[in-house]
Swiss-Prot record:
Disulfide bonds: none annotated. The keyword Membrane applies. GO terms for biological process: mRNA transport; nuclear pore organization; protein transport. This is Nucleoporin Ndc1. It comes from Drosophila pseudoobscura pseudoobscura. Residues 43-60, 128-144, 224-236 are perinuclear space. It comes from the Eukaryota. Keywords: Membrane, mRNA transport, Nuclear pore complex, Nucleus, Protein transport, Translocation, Transmembrane, Transmembrane helix, Transport. One of its GO terms (molecular function) is protein-macromolecule adaptor activity. Belongs to the NDC1 family. It is a multi-pass membrane protein. GO terms for cellular component: nuclear membrane; nuclear pore transmembrane ring. It holds the Pfam family Ndc1_Nup.
Length: 579
């Protein structure tokens, strides 16, 4: 299978999982609506009537038709979330490049958040009391703008904006791989309980913040709406006490905010649940497969660096395969394949893993050169300039040699014309005057300082220190799984590798891990100052140290044969002693 067909096959499978997440999210909308109606229509003395009325409202035709706009917004939200999961993770060195690449996508995602928040508030207000249900109501035999309805609609928009700013504005969507695999029903129940309970607490701050904003600017908004629709102004929420003392309105706003936040959090969790499921990969390429069958191997999936999700799933699959304790499945890695009885499976896997190690380490070294604390390029010794006395003595020696040759009739090897060219004084070479060079350098430095003093230029068009290093560490999850899987393969090869296909590559594997460990040790002094990758750095460094330790312990008797005596062998022995 070609590289392009591998990408298409993986994206098609992930797109199907995203559709399943969207369908589950649509079903959850009715569960959230049921919970909201149970709170709004609460009747302690008539519990059966309370539950029956709530269920009849959820199952009514009005609910099914009124929820169509919200379902459409949820589907749009899910498609944008799917696109962000499958998009390539590009590094933007400057903030201007980040705006050019990510701003259109972020603006579209913000619009989806606002739309879901507004339509959720619009749908839920239809089940409240008459004062909250419509945009205007009868007051003193006239039509008036309902400030309660405006407050709740604005609360929905503000809740969607709040979730986008706090979760998605500066961060990319990530998949959380569970440490312990549970049944699908257990995971769904855990996500529902935790999301609903957490949203009740997290919705307090945005509710209070929006209430303060509505007290400051709500009157202006209601006045504009009354002027647009040619109706009277509602005066029930004028002043601070008019807003702060309305307990029912504040309760509805808090409950609505918690529903919107939990809804968006559940959509994010559902995508993580479906996309983190085990990917159907193969170790050995089935040569007898039909042409229509698109079988993706682990090696091919690990090579898809432009689809980060697939690379993570392939690395996780390899890690689970090695650590599951099934020796029969691991034997596919060591077996010899036809034709030629060559270790094709191990050869391709080892080359791909070493390529991942090498590329990541090289990029990490290049990015660390831009950190001022770690900057240390090897300096070459300066060239010794020729002094004027040495130049004069050389010219005098040439003149004496020419006179001696003419006196004794010795011809020159080269023609006199060539001698004239060679003996031309160095001072006659045309050079740019020193004052011109100094002037041009001063002008260049002055212009650069002038540009840097313009507000926003340095902020927008300069690469922050350590940004590339932070980007690499944040996206190092595939490397964490691959390093641990490869070390376990090397350890198991002592008993399961009957042909010795792994031992020939052990020196290269140890050197690659040791090289990466050395660079991470250098970075440990400044990792806390980098923005974002603190936990990622700790996880990666711990995985490298642990993997190298397992290999060194398993092959401790043979280290001197695998690695020649020297600094590398001393470092490996130090790793064993430290652990």
């Amino acid at each position: 299978m070609s590289h392009l067909s591998t990408i298409n096959a993986c994206k098609l499978l992930l797109f199907r999982r995203c559709l399943q997440a969207v369908l589950l999210t649509v079903g959850i909308q009715f569960l959230l609506l049921t919970i909201f109606l149970l709170f709004v229509n609460f009747q302690l003395l008539r519990p059966l009537h309370w539950i029956s009325v709530t269920l009849s409202l959820v199952c009514s035709m009005y609910t099914w038709f009124a929820s169509i706009p919200l379902v459409g917004a949820v589907v749009l939200y899910g498609m944008i979330l799917c696109q962000q999961h499958l998009a390539e993770r590009l590094y933007c060195p400057t903030r201007f490049r980040w705006l050019v690449h990510y701003a259109p996508r972020k603006l579209l995602f913000l619009a989806a958040h606002l739309l879901v928040g507004y339509l959720t508030a619009w749908l839920y207000t239809g089940y409240m009391h008459t004062d909250y249900r419509h945009l205007w109501y009868k007051c003193y035999d006239q039509e008036c703008i309902s400030a309660y309805h405006v407050y709740l609609l604005g609360m929905g928009i503000f809740a969607g904006c709040y979730y986008f700013v706090s979760v998605h504005m500066r961060q990319e969507v990530e998949i959380e791989f569970p440490i312990v695999n549970h049944l699908w029903g257990e995971k769904l129940r855990e996500v529902l309980y935790s999301s609903l309970a957490r949203s009740l607490i997290k919705s307090l701050l945005p509710t209070l913040a929006y209430t303060l904003l509505f007290w400051l600017f709500g009157g202006v908004v209601c006045h504009k709406l009354s002027h647009i629709f040619a109706v009277d102004l509602d005066e029930r929420l004028e002043g601070f006490f008019g807003v702060a003392t309305n307990g029912r309105l504040l309760f509805y706003g808090w409950l609505l905010t918690s529903q919107i936040l939990s809804n968006m959090h559940l959509m994010r969790c559902f995508y993580s649940m479906f996309l983190s499921e085990e990917f159907p990969l193969a170790i050995t390429k089935n040569r007898a497969a039909f042409v229509q069958e698109k079988e993706v191997t682990v090696v091919a999936a690990l090579g898809l660096s432009n689809v980060y999700v697939v690379q993570c799933l392939a690395a996780k699959y390899l890690y689970n395969l090695v650590t599951a304790g099934d020796a029969e499945k691991r034997s596919e890695l060591f077996q010899l394949t036809e034709p030629g009885n060559r270790p094709a499976n191990w050869r391709s896997l080892c080359d791909q893993c070493l390529s991942l190690f090498g590329n990541f380490t090289d990029e990490l070294i290049d990015s660390m050169q831009k950190i001022s604390v770690l900057k240390g390029s090897p300096s070459s010794p300066p060239l010794t300039p020729i002094s004027e006395n040495a130049s004069a003595s050389l010219m005098a020696e040439r003149v004496l040699t020419r006179q001696y040759n003419q006196m004794h009739g010795i011809r020159a090897i080269v023609s006199p014309r060539s001698n004239a060219v060679i003996d031309r004084p160095v001072d006659r070479i045309h050079r740019v005057p020193d004052w011109c060079e100094r002037t041009s350098m001063q002008l260049e430095q002055s212009l650069q300082l002038l540009i840097n003093r313009i507000p926003g230029i340095v902020y927008m068009f300069t690469e922050p220190e350590g940004a590339k290093t932070a980007f690499l560490l944040t996206h190092s999850l595939p490397l964490v799984f691959v390093i641990q899987a490869l070390s376990q393969i090397c350890v198991f090869s002592l008993k399961e590798d009957r042909y010795g296909v792994v031992q020939t590559d052990l020196p290269d594997i140890i050197r690659s891990m040791s090289r990466l460990k050395g660079e991470l040790d250098k970075l440990s002094s400044v990792a806390s100052n980098l923005r974002g990758p603190g936990s990622s750095f700790s996880v990666l460094r711990g995985a490298v140290r642990r993997s190298l330790f397992h290999i060194c312990v398993a092959f401790g008797e043979y280290l001197s044969e695998l690695i020649p005596s020297g600094e590398e062998l001393h470092q490996l022995q130090t790793v064993i002693n430290q652990e």
